[in-house]
């Protein structure tokens, strides 16, 4: 769903009303809910950075990529429907950003490192993709952090 903060808030309240759930917390970029014992986060933006310049670049990068990500549909097993999943190149950049965010704001756990490991491992990098990836990471201020990982 490509929606603004108010639309996300309305969706959250609608979901909890229809499922006897509850709204747990709200932060700058998400609203947390519990539905049938399952914790869910609805994001108005997938991420943000404290540095004004890099945050602006990140928001533009996310907007440029939203259609490709929302349109990348994958069939679930047993014919249970389809879901949108990130493209491999987007996922590689986003998971590194996510790891970066945890490093500076919430603490990094093995979970975030393993998530990034599997994304990078699955994404067979050829020279053309590597060049594009390097450009995006430099643009977003993540290139040196990538070197540390």
Labelled PLM ranges:
Residues 3-149:
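Conserved NTP-donor binding/palm subdomain of two-metal-ion nucleotidyltransferases/polymerases, i.e.
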């Amino acid at each position: 769903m490509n929606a603004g903060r108010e639309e996300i808030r309305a969706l959250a309240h609608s979901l909890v009303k229809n499922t006897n759930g509850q709204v747990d917390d709200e932060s700058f970029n998400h609203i947390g809910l519990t539905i049938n014992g399952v914790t869910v986060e609805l994001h108005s933006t997938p991420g943000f950075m404290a540095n004004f310049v890099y945050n602006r670049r990140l928001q533009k990068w996310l907007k440029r990529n939203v259609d490709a990500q929302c349109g990348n549909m994958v069939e679930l097993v047993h014919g249970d429907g389809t879901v949108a999943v990130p493209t491999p190149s987007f996922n590689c950049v986003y998971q590194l950003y996510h790891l970066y965010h945890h490093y500076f704001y919430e603490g990094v756990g093995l979970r975030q490192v393993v998530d990034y490991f599997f994304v990078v491992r699955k994404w067979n990098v050829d020279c053309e993709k590597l060049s594009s990836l390097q450009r995006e990471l430099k643009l977003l201020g993540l290139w040196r952090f990538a070197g540390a990982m």
